[in-house]
Amino acid sequence: MMKRFVALSMAIFSLSFAQDVDEKIKALEEQIESLQKELQELKKAKEETEVLKEEFRKLRLEIVMPEAYKPYAGLGPAASKVYQVKKGVSIGGYGELHYINNPDNDPSSIIDLKRLILYFGYSFTENLKFNSEIEIEHAFVEGGEESGELAVEFAYLDYNFSPKFGLRGGMLLIPVGIVNELHEPPTFPTVDRPYLERNIIPTTWSENGIGIYGDTDLISYRAYIVNGMKAEEGEFKASAPLKKLRQNGGEAVSDSLAFTGRIDFKLPNNLTVGASTFISGVQNEDGKNLGNIYLFSPHLWWQYAGWDVRFVGAYATVSDAEKITLELSSATCDKSTCNVFPKRMQGFYLQVAYNILRHFDTEQELYVFGVYENYDTHASVPSGYEKPKGSEVQIFNFGISYKPHPLVALKADYVREDYKDKKDNDIYRAAITWMF
């Protein structure tokens, strides 16, 4: 009898204990589910906070610089001022003073007012605009680009039917890469423009022509027909092959024409992904076609939550590069002495910058950045010619860009030029830059 009682008691206790455990497990599961919901809500709140921070930053920028804040149809903020004026004159500009120290050079240090720019625009109506950029390089004009230059960078008429479609004609910026159109110094963190966008994409690059542009919530685009490139005998810089072929608006030979276009896709969190191209015949001074150039450039740009990340690639092929080489060179040179024009150019750069002051209650910005570039201006050359030394290079660039005001940037950086077949270079740079 006692055994039955004990067994029954144990069974009742076990059942009660099991029920108690089940209840505790159920309670724990409910607590876990509740915590998971709270975590999801916190994550969502954090994302919303980041969005609000970014919107607040943009609002502060609009308050600080309402006129120059909005870039328009591929142009930089200062170059877009005419589009904010309903009627009458608009004036903007930018400038940059550079300090360059290269211990291997003589002299090792220079200070140069590299560029002083005036934007002059006129709004005939809300739809019909004139816009221009006039540039002085190296503070004065003496003769020859290295001694100073006075130049028109662009000058065109623009008729905007709607934000989605407009017509543009005149001397136009070629819409390839990022910096050629948007080149005001405070808009990028490095002291100078990226090497790739100087030596393969020949910034600043303008040609005469006509075309269309537009901007929607999802995409923006530009497509122009312009004068083609021209090769003529004279000084040819192998480190930047396309620069000599630009015509830049002055009495441009146009027997061969060029097409250039660009498309950008606008993705969430202020991410832009796109590509651009330039396809052109290369003509001599008499208009005779020597060959063709095909340039393609993919790009990515992400500006969000303090980050400024950019990627630009460039790939160019040239048909009949030997004909272009001979046209550019003196009549007395041969394959061993001619400065060869490439059959193929290629490269890319990646920039990562972060504003460390975004965590503080300030309108000022302090970007720390790193840039890696890898390119070859002569990835392939005509048969029998040798690649020029220094064509294949890696660039390592680190520095800071302090913006006490959105329109002003004080910069300092270090550049390592790492060449495959010649002595490397270490360069220390600083700059005072502004736009308005």
UniProtKB/Swiss-Prot annotation:
Phylogenetic lineage: Bacteria, Pseudomonadati, Aquificota, Aquificia, Aquificales
InterPro entries found in the cross-reference section: Porin_dom_sf
Highest taxon of source = Bacteria
Keyword list, A-Z: Signal
Protein's organism? Aquifex aeolicus (strain VF5)
Name of the protein: Uncharacterized protein aq_1259
Secretion signal span: 1-18
